[in-house]
Amino acid sequence: MSCPVIELTQQLIRRPSLSPDDAGCQALMIERLRAIGFTVERMDFGDTQNFWAWRGQGETLAFAGHTDVVPAGDADRWINPPFEPTIRDGMLFGRGAADMKGSLAAMVVAAERFVAQHPNHKNRLAFLITSDEEASAKNGTVRVVETLMERHERLDYCLVGEPSSTEVVGDVVKNGRRGSLTCNLTIHGVQGHVAYPHLADNPVHRAAPMLNELVNIEWDKGNEFFPPTSMQIANLQAGTGSNNVIPGDFSVQFNFRFSTELTDEMIKSRVVALLEKYELRYSVDWWLSGQPFLTQRGKLVDAVVNAIAHYNEIKPQLLTTGGTSDGRFIARMGAQVVELGPVNATIHKINECVNAADLQLLARMYQRIMEQLVA
């Protein structure tokens, strides 16, 4: 299939960029962007490669994404080697095809076509690309955003190429994301022999009533834009592995995906109050992965909806469901942020794939968004 979007996607897939290793993907993108007049600034931090590229000046539309991918898993279970892109029955297979090398290729080709038609565009077009989104995400987009904010860089609109679609490209646009807060809690007891419980203090038994109340809390009812806040226990750990030892400590890890009805401080206060209510001895460590954000109808959402309607003749759902993305960092700059990308049915799975025609369509949509906001 001779198509610049498909060809570039295949070139990117061939580079096994397991997070945070970029494996040469960004060099490929940078070469293409410099060729059409972009200024490129590398912003590497630690083991992570990032770049910020721009063309023009004024009101700024940035396209954001990541070159890293998750591990392929058992390569023998793939219909073809995961880093050897193959097209079968119109589907392009390979790790990263949907998440998100197809989007990156569509962005670059859209920019090439846009610049060819609008060499003197009135506003600024930019790219923010990282190699660490799938892993720790500590030296990636968040560090670039901090640098841009320190020098008061302008960012008005940002389109993140995450695979937002569910059945056909453009059927879902993410115009916000829930916040993510993780609690690492340890309940302290006294270790002892199970035959002499009066000489010990079992932290699992102590914690059980508190955990029962915790999992039954209705945190909020959500709102027009967000589903209700969710709390899920992710990991439990206690004991020595022996059946005759009462554990001394009991570790519980739980995560909140929270709406704009709550703040992280409100959640923390309620959890601590619960621990105090049950008179537990504990230590606690919190990790805030991201605050909730929302982009309401405005120039960016309107441009995205227009592009989808023009090329796919559908009206997208505007949703805030799903996991976190780097959009949570970019929103700190005050930018309108949305996510539009290919169908996400196979992301992170064996035999990850994307409809090749969808990537061609996505490039056209991206180009039309550029035309509405940058030309």
Swiss-Prot record:
Superkingdom in the source lineage: Bacteria
Coiled-coil intervals: none
NCBIfam families registered for this protein in UniProt: dapE_proteo (TIGR01246), PRK13009.1 (NF009557)
Residues the record marks as active site: 68, 133 (proton acceptor)
Enzyme's top EC category: hydrolase
GO BP terms in the entry: diaminopimelate biosynthetic process; L-arginine biosynthetic process; lysine biosynthetic process via diaminopimelate
Pathway annotation: Amino-acid biosynthesis; L-lysine biosynthesis via DAP pathway; LL-2,6-diaminopimelate from (S)-tetrahydrodipicolinate (succinylase route): step 3/3
InterPro entries: ArgE/DapE_CS (IPR001261), Bact_exopeptidase_dim_dom (IPR036264), DapE_proteobac (IPR005941), Peptidase_M20 (IPR002933), Peptidase_M20_dimer (IPR011650), Peptidase_M20A (IPR050072)
SUPFAM superfamilies in the cross-refs: Bacterial exopeptidase dimerisation domain, Zn-dependent exopeptidases
HAMAP family: DapE
Keyword Phosphoprotein: no
Gene name linked to the record: dapE
Protein name: Succinyl-diaminopimelate desuccinylase
Reactions listed under catalytic activity: N-succinyl-(2S,6S)-2,6-diaminopimelate + H2O = (2S,6S)-2,6-diaminopimelate + succinate
Cofactor dependence: Zn(2+); Co(2+)
Cofactor note (record): Binds 2 Zn(2+) or Co(2+) ions per subunit.
GO MF term set: acetylornithine deacetylase activity; cobalt ion binding; succinyl-diaminopimelate desuccinylase activity; zinc ion binding
Residues annotated for Zn(2+) 2 binding in this entry: 99, 134, 348
The entry's keywords: Amino-acid biosynthesis, Cobalt, Diaminopimelate biosynthesis, Hydrolase, Lysine biosynthesis, Metal-binding, Zinc
Pfam families named among the record's database cross-references: M20_dimer (PF07687), Peptidase_M20 (PF01546)
Family, similarity comment: Belongs to the peptidase M20A family. DapE subfamily.
Assembly and interaction partners: Homodimer.
General function of this protein: Catalyzes the hydrolysis of N-succinyl-L,L-diaminopimelic acid (SDAP), forming succinate and LL-2,6-diaminopimelate (DAP), an intermediate involved in the bacterial biosynthesis of lysine and meso-diaminopimelic acid, an essential component of bacterial cell walls.
Lineage: Bacteria, Pseudomonadati, Pseudomonadota, Gammaproteobacteria, Enterobacterales
EC code(s) of this entry: 3.5.1.18
Binding site for Zn(2+) 1: 66, 99, 162
